[in-house]
């Protein structure tokens, strides 16, 4: 349940009726950022007596929206990054803040469009998020969410138990790849991922080590190091 402009008034009745008829109200806050102004733009604005607006989309802004939704009966709160804009460091800040301030579970949703979706998911997991949204291997990455297979590897290394049937996921993944190939004329990607099943396959030691290094970087809030992996 969400409003693209985070207008809480627009979702009040939806939350009420979802709960009235026995549903779970998963209420989302849409993540976005303020415009970026160059130093030249700032100087011009000051010279013309039109100072640029103060930041709107602060951590406090997102927390306030989450608290409002919780007070309306949200059964969980999703930090919904529809455009893949949130970097790992900001993810860590918001997840920690939400977990400290909210009484309901917190979900994290992002995309890989700019290239750091998986790093942000790892950061969310390490900072205590309850749920992360993923995609299957053959449809993950790019404009989609990170691959569940990679998240599974990270969680295993972190000692986090996942209630997932990875064998069933592998079968679904294989079947849907066949369908994707049938629709290849409409696919922007001309290369498909190599087959991979984390239950049966393993990485070379030097690749496996990257997962450990990424976890260590995320734990230390070293965003630049995390993005290297």
Question: Across the structure, where does each feature detected by a protein language model lie?
Answer:
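Catalytic cores and adjacent flexible loops of soluble metabolic enzymes
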Residues: 4-229
């Amino acid at each position: 349940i969400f409003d693209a402009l985070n207008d809480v008034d627009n979702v009040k009745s939806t939350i009420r009726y979802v709960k009235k008829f026995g549903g779970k109200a998963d209420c989302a806050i849409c993540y976005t950022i303020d415009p970026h102004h160059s130093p030249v733009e700032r100087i011009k604005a000051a010279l013309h007596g039109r100072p640029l607006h103060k930041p709107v989309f602060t951590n406090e802004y997102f927390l306030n929206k989450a608290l409002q939704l919780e007070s309306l009966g949200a059964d969980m709160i999703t930090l919904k990054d529809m455009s893949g804009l949130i970097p790992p460091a900001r993810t860590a800040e918001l997840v920690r803040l939400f977990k400290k301030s909210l009484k309901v579970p917190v979900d994290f949703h992002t995309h890989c469009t700019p290239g750091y979706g998986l790093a942000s998911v790892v950061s969310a997991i390490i900072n205590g998020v309850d749920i992360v949204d993923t995609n299957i291997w053959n449809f993950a990455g790019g404009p989609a969410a990170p691959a569940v297979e990679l998240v599974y590897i990270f969680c295993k290394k972190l000692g986090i138990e996942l209630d997932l049937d990875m064998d069933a996921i592998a079968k679904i993944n294989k079947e849907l790849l066949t369908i994707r190939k049938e629709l290849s004329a409409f696919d922007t990607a001309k290369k498909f991922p190599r087959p991979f099943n984390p239950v049966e396959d393993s990485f070379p030691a030097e690749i496996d080590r990257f997962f450990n290094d990424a976890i260590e970087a995320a734990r230390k809030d070293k965003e630049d190091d995390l993005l290297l992996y």
